[in-house]
Each structure stands twice: as C-alpha cells, then as structure tokens.
C-alpha cells in the first residue's frame, strides 16, 4: 500500500510548527522545523557532506519514527516580490536508506488558501542516492500572500539538502504540478456547445 504524505503536508504545515529547544541549536539559520511528526526526526546543520561549500542540512528519522508522519525543514517568505510570475525552486538532495524524501513548494493566497503546490509526491527520492539536483516550477498569482518551501523525510532514513535557489523563469517553462493556477483565466465561457 502506497502511503502518500500529500494530505498531511498540506494540512499540518499550517498548524504544526515545532519548537524543540534541544534541536534548534543545530537548525540552520532562517529555517523552521515543521511536520506532522517532527518530534520523530533529528534536524541538523551537517559539516560532513555538502553538494558544494562546507555545510548542508539533514533530517534523520529516529528509530521509532511514525509510519504515517514526516519531518520537514522549511522557510516561509512574503510573496510581494514574486507575484505575477513563474518561479523555479531548485535544490540538491542526497539520501541514505530513505523511505520517501521530497522537496516541496507551496504558494498561499488569502486565508491560507493553497493556490499552487508541488511536493514531488509522484517522484519521491527513495533508498540511497548521491547529490542530485531537483526542480519544482510553480506560478505565483497576483493574489499570492506567502511562499513556503523546503524538503522533508517520511518514515525512515536520512535526507540531506543543499543549495536551494528560487529563480524567476519564463512562462514557457512548464509547471511541475497540475495544481498550479494558470496565470490568467478566460473572461467568458468557451466552446460551451463542444462544436470547436
């Protein structure tokens, strides 16, 4: 049976920010610990491996980690400087015995309504892998309020993340998730009689 963390990440990222004093000392500056089972994971700034530079961040499942939860390192930024454009989140992930490791990006509108979302659910990183670059492309509509992004681990193993970058791309670059809201909608119904 496939366990999909799509629903948990959508719901719990709004309400499950976790402050764990003993872990916060190792959390990279600017990043937040969250997730439906963040207490089941160890988060760290890691100086033993990096895609480039000296450091990466890691998420490691504890031996008794919940089979239904996940832990994430994330950031949430104001969408003011990103509206009315298509944006690409890229980053490097490396895994060791990972059940599911995934990079993710979410665009929120008013009242925390999700307007664009991709968490690589159809293309998770599993097992043991070397440093590999991944990309997510989403639209940020004019009514966007926040952009959240990060990477997570579900169930078991370790994932490292490094060199995340958010950059504007042309509208010809395809979005990576069908949940993206088109940049504009038609003003009138089209082909209502199906003759075209």
Positions of predicted regions on the chain:
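Extracellular and organelle-lumenal recognition/adhesion modules and their flexible linkers in secreted
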Residues: 22-196
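N-terminal secretory signal peptides that target proteins for export/translocation
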Residues: 1-6
């Amino acid at each position: 049976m496939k366990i999909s963390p799509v629903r948990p990440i959508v719901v719990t990222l709004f309400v499950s920010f976790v402050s764990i004093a003993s872990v916060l000392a190792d959390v990279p500056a600017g990043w937040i610990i969250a997730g439906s089972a963040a207490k089941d994971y160890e988060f760290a700034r890691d100086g033993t491996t990096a895609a480039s530079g000296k450091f990466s961040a890691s998420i490691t499942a504890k031996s008794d980690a919940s089979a239904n939860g996940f832990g994430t390192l994330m950031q949430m930024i104001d969408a003011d400087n990103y509206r009315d454009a298509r944006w690409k989140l890229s980053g490097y992930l490396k895994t060791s015995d990972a059940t599911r490791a995934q990079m993710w990006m979410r665009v929120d509108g008013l009242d925390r309504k999700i307007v664009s979302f991709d968490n690589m659910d159809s293309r998770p990183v599993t097992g043991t892998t070397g440093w590999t670059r991944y990309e997510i492309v989403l639209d940020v509509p004019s009514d966007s309020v926040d952009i959240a992004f990060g990477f997570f681990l579900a169930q078991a193993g370790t994932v490292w993340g490094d060199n995340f970058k958010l950059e504007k791309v042309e509208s010809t670059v395809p979005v990576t998730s069908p949940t993206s809201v088109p940049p504009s909608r038609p003003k009138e119904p089209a082909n209502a009689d199906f003759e075209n």
